[in-house]
Amino acid sequence: MSEKHTNSSYLVTDFRKLTSPIVDVRSPSEFCQGHWPGAINVPLFSDTERQAIGKSYKKESRLKAIFNGLKTTIPKTTKLLKLILETTLKDEGVSRSLRIYCWRGGMRSKAFAWLARTIGINTYLLKGGYKSYRKWVLNQFEADLPIRLIGGKTGTRKTDLLNYINNKNIHVIDLEGIANHRGSSFGSLGMEEQPTTQQFENIIAESLDKFHTNNATEIWLEAESSNLGKCRIP
């Protein structure tokens, strides 16, 4: 899909075809709970600020919440503009466009996009925001997929076998690698912190999408219990 100079909102399927860096403008705690894999978090509000603005929306009015949001954001404008420029330089070369999303594709992403456009950055918004992305993720698990499971006792080198058979016709999903957990015997000893179940699902969904785009014929993965540590297998 060619990237036109536009500030329109895109459905998930079209948004993912674009190549610009992805910016998640939600609060840090929202981002940690789950995000589009590869997205960069540039929060418009901190967790505390978001709570306060949400409270004014519920107890006072939408207009009051907007005023409070502007009052919070305006002093940070210079810092946000610098972060926007840094984000456009993360990939090789200079990207003059950004993909942006918030929770529902509302005022946070639109306000951030406006800031980016003031310094000549083209913006592409995700229609429906992260909420629509999560719907896309969960839909990936509803499909009838040609899954093959590898079973065996601990230490029988099942992961090595998966790595060996991985080729263009067979798509391998390393559940233990994604979950940062080696199963019941070794757990997460010596591994990085586990992702949330939500983020675990997001990463698997992206892998399933690669299965389709690469025209593979089978999906191979290691047979696991319903959970890998704190990650629940969808």
PLM feature spans:
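Short, charged, surface-exposed secondary-structure boundary motifs
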Residues: 49-55, 133-137, 182-188
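Glycine-rich phosphate-binding P-loop
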Residues: 106-109, 146-167
